[in-house]
C-alpha cells in the first residue's frame, strides 16, 4: 500500500513540517499527501515518465525529486486541473471533480510550493503564485416551513420528551447550527 511513509524525501519533509510545526492533524496531512501523489502521478504521465496506458492508481511517486518539482510550470497545473475536472472519478462515481475538490488540491499545491520557496528555500520560483482557485458555488441554507417545524415538534416523544422539545424549540427559534446546539450544556 502506498502511504506517506513511502513519499519521496521532498514531500515527506513538507508533510512533517505541517504535522509538527503547523500542528495540522494526521488526517489533514494524509490528505495533503494524497493530493500531492495525485498531482505527481499526473505529471509523470504528462511528461512521459511512465507509459500513457499505465494504471493511474499504481504509479509510484517515490522517484519524484527536486528537479521534477522545479520543472513544474503554471501550464502544467492548469493541465492538471483540466484533468481533474474531466477525468478523475468523483464520490458519486461520475467523471470530474467538483470545484470545491479542485480548490482543495490547489490549496495543497500552494502550500507545498510556498513551503519550498519561503521555508525550505529549495525553490526560487513558485509556479502557483498566480494561480486562481475555481469559483465555488455557495448553496443557501434550507429552512423548514412552518408546517414542517410543527410536524418536527409534534414527533417528539419518549422518556426525555420535555428536554427534547425544549432543545428543538431552541434550535428552531434561534437558528442555531447543530454544532452550536451540541456545545450547549
Predicted regions and their residues:
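Conserved catalytic core of the tyrosine transesterase superfamily
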Residues: 1-185
Amino acid at each position: 500500500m502506498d502511504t506517506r511513509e513511502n513519499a519521496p524525501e521532498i514531500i515527506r519533509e513538507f508533510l512533517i513540517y505541517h504535522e509538527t510545526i503547523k500542528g495540522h492533524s494526521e488526517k489533514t496531512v494524509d490528505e495533503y499527501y494524497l493530493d500531492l501523489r495525485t498531482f505527481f502521478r499526473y505529471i509523470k504521465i504528462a511528461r512521459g515518465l511512465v507509459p500513457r496506458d499505465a494504471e493511474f492508481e499504481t504509479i509510484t511517486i517515490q522517484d519524484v525529486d527536486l528537479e521534477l518539482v522545479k520543472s513544474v510550470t503554471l501550464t502544467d497545473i492548469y493541465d492538471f486541473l483540466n484533468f481533474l475536472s474531466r477525468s478523475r472519478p468523483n464520490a458519486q462515481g461520475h467523471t470530474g471533480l467538483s470545484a470545491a475538490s479542485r480548490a482543495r488540491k490547489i490549496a495543497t499545491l500552494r502550500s507545498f510550493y510556498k513551503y519550498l520557496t519561503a521555508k525550505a528555500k529549495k525553490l526560487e520560483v513558485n509556479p502557483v503564485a498566480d494561480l486562481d482557485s475555481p469559483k465555488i458555488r455557495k448553496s443557501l441554507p434550507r429552512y423548514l416551513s412552518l408546517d414542517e417545524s410543527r410536524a418536527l415538534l409534534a414527533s417528539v416523544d419518549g422518556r426525555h420528551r420535555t428536554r427534547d422539545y425544549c432543545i428543538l424549540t431552541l434550535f428552531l427559534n434561534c437558528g442555531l447550527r447543530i454544532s452550536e446546539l451540541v456545545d450547549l450544556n
